[in-house]
Amino acid sequence: MLPRITSNVSVFPTEPDANPLQEWLESLASIATRVPDDVLVLPSHNEPFRGLHERLKTLITGHEQRLARMHTELAMPKRAVDVFGVLFRRHVGADMLIMATGESVAHLNCLIARALAVRELDASGVAWYRRA
């Protein structure tokens, strides 16, 4: 649990159909029911903080909003790299491409699991995503 940024939730090449984002969102909701709000959070980055439940709510809401925007973007078929703008405010350079692609696919796989999107491979094996 980090006070300002969100964890990188990514799909890795070894499990291309995984849905780690849904699992992560469910774990955040579970933490809210099991850990008191006034607990002192000791994050791996930045300073300790209180207000766990508000932070959990902010994280869940933020990712749900990104999922909704991504769904809107999929009116026309897109590749995972084509929806970076929905997730990231800054340009994704070569040094962040693998991590950004993994996070993009995590959001796309979540939409697929919710029956809101589909993935189709073209003749070259490139995955294209569109609304279901």
Question: Model segments located where?
Answer:
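Metallo-beta-lactamase
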Residues: M1-L67
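C-terminal regulatory/interaction regions
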Residues: R69-A132
